[in-house]
């Protein structure tokens, strides 16, 4: 008996392009539905701890001002 055919790509390209090959829609914020609850709670605290741009710039300027008169640390 002859061996049967294992694979063919016949007509697959036509079938795929019949309705067009579309890119997946880009999601700005991915859904958290079904995600681990423990992770989501931790994520909430992590987001709350982030500083706004203005706050971080203000803290940076304060840090620079406090180091103004001090000598630079010596590295060995």
From Swiss-Prot:
Region of interest (Disordered), ranges: 1-33, 47-76
Gene Ontology biological-process annotations: cytoplasmic translation
Entry GO MF terms: structural constituent of ribosome
Basic residues bias spans: 1-29
Stretches with biased composition (Basic and acidic residues): 51-62
Gene Ontology, cellular component aspect: cytosolic large ribosomal subunit; cytosolic ribosome
Modified residues (Phosphoserine): 31
Keyword match Ribonucleoprotein: yes
Keywords attached to this entry: Phosphoprotein, Ribonucleoprotein, Ribosomal protein
InterPro entries: Ribosomal_eL29
Domain of life: Eukaryota
Keyword RNA-binding (UniProt): no
Signal peptide coordinates: none
One family name in Pfam for this protein: Ribosomal_L29e
Family designation: Belongs to the eukaryotic ribosomal protein eL29 family.
Full protein name: Large ribosomal subunit protein eL29
Organism: Drosophila melanogaster (Fruit fly)
Name of the encoding gene: RpL29
């Amino acid at each position: 008996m002859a061996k049967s055919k294992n694979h063919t790509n016949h007509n697959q390209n036509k079938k795929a392009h019949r309705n067009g090959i579309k890119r997946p829609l880009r999601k700005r914020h991915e859904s958290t539905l079904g995600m681990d609850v423990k992770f989501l709670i931790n994520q909430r605290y992590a987001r709350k701890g982030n500083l706004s741009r203005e706050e971080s710039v203000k803290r940076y300027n304060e840090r620079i001002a406090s180091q103004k008169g001090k000598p630079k640390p010596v590295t060995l």
